[in-house]
């Protein structure tokens, strides 16, 4: 008789523990994305992304793979050929970039993509 009560209490405690420790809140599980891609500016939005993720290997001095992404005049060549988007989106036929590092986030890719759609201006 005593064993049954202990078992009942144990099951009740376990049920409370497992059901009370978790809750579904959409904002916690799926945080809103605050990726603003309106009116992209090369100087304000794109150059900083390239500087953080690309300049280590693709600057005027290093020029790895004969690719220089320092400055709009250099970047626009890779934009026009499709190489920039192909590389950062890891598309077939392109070297996935950045190599040996974390891929660009979806927001960073969206910003670059929208900047290109908006004319890839040197602004």
Predicted regions and their residues:
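Sec-dependent bacterial lipoprotein signal peptides
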Residues: 1-21
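Aromatic- and Gly/Pro-enriched helix-to-coil junctions and flexible linker segments
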Residues: 21-123
């Amino acid at each position: 008789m005593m064993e049954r009560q202990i078992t009942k209490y144990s099951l009740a405690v376990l049920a409370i523990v497992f059901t009370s420790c978790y809750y579904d809140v959409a904002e916690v599980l799926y945080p809103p994305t605050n990726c603003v891609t309106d009116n992209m500016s090369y100087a304000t939005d794109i150059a900083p992304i390239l500087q953080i993720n690309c300049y280590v290997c693709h600057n005027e001095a290093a020029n790895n793979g004969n690719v220089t992404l320092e400055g709009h005049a250099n970047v626009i060549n890779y934009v026009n050929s499709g190489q920039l988007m192909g590389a950062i989106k890891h598309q077939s036929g392109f070297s996935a970039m950045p190599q040996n590092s974390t891929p660009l986030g979806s927001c960073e890719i969206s910003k670059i993509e929208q900047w290109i759609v908006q004319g890839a201006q040197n602004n």
